Amino acid sequence: MHPRRGFTLVELLVVIAIIGILAGLLLPALAKAKNQAAKATDINNLKQMMVAIHIYADDNNDRAPWPNWAGGDRAPDGTSRPGWLYTLDPTQDAPDCFKYETGVLWDTLKTAKIYVCPMDDVKKWRTSVVMGGAEVQRDQQLSSYAMNGAVIGYQDDGYPPVKLGAMRSQDILFWETDEKEPHYFNDGANYPPEGVSGRHQAGAIQAAFDGSVTYTRLDAWYEEESNPNRNRLWCYPGTVDGRKPL
């Protein structure tokens, strides 16, 4: 009977090298597959949100919900306006002043996961350029998505929001906000130049008023955002440039 021979050092090194090569080939494919799965989840999330938006509008004279624009979250009488994402609790500090269950879409959605991209770490500490390089967390840690402030003309006193019928079907209502800047998550709405995430292969998912949900590349987004005329991002009705009314 011949004794069993173990691996030689050279053979072991060859096996390790082969494993390393295979891992190098597989990891990018796995990362791409993970990203594709996250994009699919985002598309599904935003489609459900748009269904909830239209249900809300059907019950509210065709009006969009309050976008949770921070400067107008409190009404003139001091009460908090119910918004798409939350109703501000003035007795609590951030992030505890924001709660899903107080938002007007919650009764339709009823699932916190719908508000978040699987690849977005909402509690991560990041360097804020806007806040002078400080390491901070987001104030609002509920959602990866922001509503377009166009529904109130980007104004604190823009209540009530526009009617859906006043918007063009392909105007953009929701997008994935740029996660690299925590300050952009101080509320539930944004200006277009505050930007979109690039975590999906240099692009993000966006939703239009007609309920369609699409992928946009960063270069396409910023090209449209920089357009001085009314476009799908700057889309407040009744104005030439889609920005604030005069």
Q: For each of these PLM feature ranges, what is it?
A:
Residues 2-44:
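Amphipathic alpha-helical segments typified by the pilin-like N-terminal helix
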